[in-house]
Amino acid sequence: MGQDLPLLLSAALGKKVNRPPVWMMRQAGRYMKIYRDLRERYPSFRERSENPELSYEISMQPFHAFKPDGVILFSDILTPLPGMGINFEIIESKGPIIEDPIRNLNQIENLKELNPSESLSFVGQVLSSLKKDVNNEATVLGFVGAPWTLAAYVVEGKSSKNYSLIKSMAFKEPGLLHKLLDHFAKSIGEYLKYQIKSGAQVVQIFDSWAGQLSPEDYDIFAGPYQKKVVDIVKAEHPETPVILYISGSAGVIERMAKTGIDIISLDWTVDIEEACKRIPSGIGIQGNVDPGILFGNKESIKERIDNTFNKTKDRKYILNLGHGILPGTPEENAQTFFEHGKKLTY
Amino acid sequence: MGQDLPLLLSAALGKKVNRPPVWMMRQAGRYMKIYRDLRERYPSFRERSENPELSYEISMQPFHAFKPDGVILFSDILTPLPGMGINFEIIESKGPIIEDPIRNLNQIENLKELNPSESLSFVGQVLSSLKKDVNNEATVLGFVGAPWTLAAYVVEGKSSKNYSLIKSMAFKEPGLLHKLLDHFAKSIGEYLKYQIKSGAQVVQIFDSWAGQLSPEDYDIFAGPYQKKVVDIVKAEHPETPVILYISGSAGVIERMAKTGIDIISLDWTVDIEEACKRIPSGIGIQGNVDPGILFGNKESIKERIDNTFNKTKDRKYILNLGHGILPGTPEENAQTFFEHGKKLTY
């Protein structure tokens, strides 16, 4: 069963597999020396993520190093913004800066609908190259940011600690925010479809900042727009597995399960055994391993992987971290994570 | 029933009250103009929190402005550190800097046992003045940081994003970390007893960073040391209510309930109705209101308070935010929070 499909895709589709697939969020990046070397030559993040040769090369770095079961596009959740008329820059160690933060109706009404094949053709190019070259030895993953998280960026104008600007908008001018969220949902849905057509076999939606919402606000500003994105994708690609990740999601995992996604990617702040009970059995689970464990040693890493795996044996499970791998992680510890992960068996 | 006791203390003791008491975490601070003015004259945070006249004056600012049901000592969770031989400075907008971060056994073995009446007499002075002057029109609260959170500060050396240094110690040299946590638990227990003897009628333990631990690590590095602090306090003051707060606690609230505390202070990322089901009925609940709601308007603030209160009617409940009030919060919105909170009735 599923012998013709790569392991991660098979598992995500619910087919019987011999071991859980393994990949890492943010598996290409700063913790790899080869990436830091390339960054010296190409210091602009936007160039690295928007020049198709560079994005392709970086996407493949962890594949060459560790042979993970998933190869994810090297890109950023903000990459589609310029195609909607929102310009941004990423300043090393400071994060993204939105050129002209979105604060009023006029700005929202002037946003362009995203035409991915026009403004994001470099992404299509990278995904089709990855699909061809990875050649089903791994599964190619695409990804997007969810509407709430994109809205938080463009309203705040930068990485925020307190989200006071977008919350002010949410509580004072909810109609304005809903217009923005709706625009993003449609555009992001189109963008995911474009990624799938270009080669992505599994896609992940990051609503990184939805964990900053109370569950009552999640039901108004995050959940419905996650669902809208999923509905747009599933209407055309019902068979493509969709993963949803939220950082700080322990209070809303039941809600995540109701958005039409196939797999919930858990952070590490919830016991995966309890999460399995709270999430309907048809929905798969990914992640949950504290990325901080990779600052330990081989023994602690292996033990944590085993503990996590043992709690998920009767579930569809994809081994992953509970958050992106952290800068400063020793590469040999990432190696251990992949090596040990591949030794697991059902 | 409880007529002689202030409202918050009565409610915390489980006595029948006519309305939930209301106070705010970090209710004295940057959002108040009177505090910012004082800060101009006394720019050193350590001076403001360690000079008993200033600490007293600041503690009383919100009492004069809003008449909350609780008056909490103006201090910092790091304040006891110098009494253990760990020096620190707080740099405005950058947070605390530990002079000589704790990284090895020798440093841990050289830590002094805290003698609060010697090194923290200014805290005793402030609490006894507050107790006298507040005169049971409100309840006087003391507080401490829990061992894990203090350890995270002194090992990382500053506010951390990823906690890679303390996690490295936890996973590679757990014995070392346990020694440090044990030292803090004993000292912090003594410090709380000193606060109670000096005038604190209710005390709150902040394990602000325990939400960064997976539940499995929480059970090793956070929970047992919270419990140890509580045991030390309860041995001498079984009647003093103890509140426990953790930021990002949605995945561990059942565990918090097992530490011997009386009241769990919830952040806003969990539905309080679900939390009430997960927490044994004998344990009280505090908080849960998103501090971001105070960037909304009067109507949204009142509605949120009502929604929260309505979900807790059969529980011991203390109205509070789910986190400290945020810098930049309009003072009139804090006013609305207190005013509306005091209009609730059982």
From Swiss-Prot, chains A, B:
Gene Ontology, cellular component aspect: cytoplasm
GO molecular function, one term: uroporphyrinogen decarboxylase activity
Record keyword Lyase present: yes
GO terms (BP aspect): protoporphyrinogen IX biosynthetic process
Assembly and oligomerization: Homodimer.
General function of this protein: Catalyzes the decarboxylation of four acetate groups of uroporphyrinogen-III to yield coproporphyrinogen-III.
Name of the molecule in the record: Uroporphyrinogen decarboxylase
